Structures are given as structure tokens and as C-alpha cells.
């Protein structure tokens, strides 16, 4: 009798890639709904543009590589890339920006490396960083949330602004953004960094309308809590593991608390860091990408903690208000090293 020795892994999860991607897409619904509520219909338009662009870009590359288009598109990874990029950019950003960022993410950051499972960097964050560096003004032109906004464009006006730059009544992004005590930076992190550099005290800054929320910035706290709810559902469904989100959030909270205690006049309080910007989106939907994150349990804890530290450092001392995208990519660079030194010992072999 001949026994065949199979290669590892000997146990595996029965879920297909398309199933896991679909679970992540479903978990994003609360976060998308919150962004629609607080920032208007532009978010939905950007998601549609990004989704179509991602599918077309992936289909084009697969066709050129003479691979099965239908079979690959069914894994839903292109849709997820487009979605993550779309919810990360301002809702009323010009249409060509989300198309450019999505095409770059799919073709350059994913397919150029060989496709799903081969890319070392998170494609959506690569697309986001390319847009942020190339078009910093447009990428920081967030509308104030509806709680403090003078006017949130309707569906037709959102389409008009995205495709032509003006509403049906002739208004543009500048007129839409201004009107809240003259503050044009419409995110809590933007406002805090700009105001501190202008010499304003933290007490003065916290009186701005953008900080009228119960816990953190107006609107943004609920958006982050919505992404947190989706992330908890992913944990419950066992689509992601707890190591990265927990270590990321604990490290970010710890660094923010220590920084705030030592320098309360220049550094933001921990609740601002935890419930503003892309904190919860990054913790549960971006850092947990199984392709670009660490693959060992100890490695995941280190990877998440490193990302949390980098987010706090970039937000506090860097040139950009929200450092999630840069932190993710910098942490991605360290994954091979982290995995090398956190490999579990093979049973029956000595360590080292």
C-alpha cells in the first residue's frame, strides 16, 4: 500500500475568498450609511464610480494576461478595493480622482504584482496615498457634517458637483465648505492640526462647532462607531481575527493618552484620535487585509501595534492630519520581517 504525503496546510477554513470578501462588503453597510447620513449622497456616487472603475480595470488586465475574467471578478476583491477607496476620499471629490485612484490601485498596486494574494501593499491605500500626494487640496475638501453644515447637497447637486464642480444653483466646493465660523477644514483632525499650528489653545479649539459631538468631532464620532459596529460583526462572523484591531486601538489609545497628559496644549485627546478620521475603518477593514498583514498571531499583535504607533506619530507630528493610510503602508513593509521572527516552532524541532 502506498501512502501519499500531502502538503500543508492540513486543516483549513472552508470559506471561499469570494465569501469572505462579501462578508466584508456587508459589514461596511453601517459605515456607508453613516457617511451618507452625515455627508450626503456624494459617498454613494463615489462608491458607484469606484466599483465600476475597479471591475473594468481588473477585467482589462485579466484580458491582457489571458486569464479568466468572469472567474476572477467573482472573488469580489476588486469591488472591495473600490469601496475602501471610495469611502476614504471626500464625498464631492471630482469624478476623475476616484477613477484615477481606483485604476491605479487595481492595475499598479494589485495586478502588476500578479493579482490577489501577491501584492505586498494594500491596494486601496496605495490609490489613496497617490491621490493625497498628487491632489492634496481636493483630498482634504471634506464637507462639514450635516449637524453643523449650512447646506448639504442633495443627490442631483452631489452629481453636479462631482462631474462639473458646481451645484445646480451655481455654488462650488468653496461655498459649500465655508459657513461654519469661517472654518474650511471640515474634519476634526484637520481643524485641530491647523489651529494648533496657528497658535490657538486647545481650549479655544474645542469650542469650534466641529467638536460639538458628545465624544469627539460632530458626525465623525458616529461614523467611526458605525464602522466599529461593522468590525464587531466581522469578528462575530470570524471573517477577521481580533489581534490586529485590538493591538492597533490599544496602542493608539495608549500613545494618545500619554501624549495628551504630557502635552495637553498641543496634542489631541485620545477620544479625538479614536473617533475621528479613518480610525475604525482602518482597524477593522484595512489593516486586517489577509494578504498584506502579518500571518502569525504574535505577528498580528506587533503589526497592529506598529500601525497604531505610526498613526499617532503622523497625526501628532507629521504633515498630514490623518495618518492611517501611510501607517498601513509603512506597516506593510515590515510584514516579511515580522513574520520571519514570529514563525511558530515546528513540532519536534528546536527553536532557532
From Swiss-Prot:
Assigned GO CC terms: plasma membrane
Name used for this protein in its record: Ion-translocating oxidoreductase complex subunit D
Entry keywords, A to Z: Cell inner membrane, Cell membrane, Electron transport, Flavoprotein, FMN, Membrane, Phosphoprotein, Translocase, Transmembrane, Transmembrane helix, Transport
Topological relation to the membrane, as annotated: Multi-pass membrane protein
EC class: translocase
Function according to Swiss-Prot or TrEMBL: Part of a membrane-bound complex that couples electron transfer with translocation of ions across the membrane. Required to maintain the reduced state of SoxR.
A biological-process GO annotation: transmembrane transport
Keyword Phosphoprotein found: yes
Subcellular localization: Cell inner membrane
Residues modified as FMN phosphoryl threonine: 187
Subunit note: The complex is composed of six subunits: RsxA, RsxB, RsxC, RsxD, RsxE and RsxG.
Cofactor or coenzyme needed: FMN
The UniProt record lists the keyword Translocase: yes
Major location category of this protein: membrane
Ranges that cross the membrane: 20-40, 42-62, 89-109, 123-143, 214-234, 242-262, 267-287, 301-321, 322-342
EC number: 7.-.-.-
Native source species: Escherichia coli O81 (strain ED1a)
